[in-house]
Amino acid sequence: YMITEWEEFLDPYIQAVGELKIKLRGIRKQYRKQNRHSPIEFVTGRVKPIESIKEKMIRRGISYDTLEQDLQDIAGLRVMVQFVDDVQEVVSILHKRQDMRIIQERDYIKHRKASGYRSYHLIIEYTVDTINGSKTILAEIQIRTLAMNFWATIEHSLNYKYQGDFPEEIKERLEITARI
């Protein structure tokens, strides 16, 4: 793929992330207007950088032909909530929506990863309308509490620093922190 082809390929994903951020923030706004506790604290989103996509394709043996189906997190959104109960609340709100279809759910809160990582992941099908017609893409929505996010961020940084080979003491501390 040339850079211009990549840009063209990523356009619908960029559009989807923009639209989904507005829609998810809209949910928060509606709760606040009614003076109710919003399960959504804040929303971030990104499109995976081209280099990261290429790297993951090599690591997983994914071809360009199957890229759209096999790489489910090219478009990624993160929904932060205050409390663990809010996670399920957000999941049920998203299940009721007509403008997206949840095709996969991974509950790393109930079933935390060995590392202690906790988060709720949804893979959705989402359709964007472009001047060339409509295009359905896959996007990943991660829902987690602020504490889980803080933990995941630290774990990610440590992984980077120690190349995944943590000193035992840090590993123990991380596991204790993950339980909070």
Predicted regions and their residues:
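Long beta-strand-rich cores associated with HINT superfamily self-processing modules
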Residues: 68, 81-180
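Short, structured coil/loop segments at alpha-helix boundaries
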Residues: 3-6, 10, 79, 164-167
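Charge-rich, low-complexity segments
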Residues: 1-72
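Short amphipathic alpha-helical segments
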Residues: 73-77
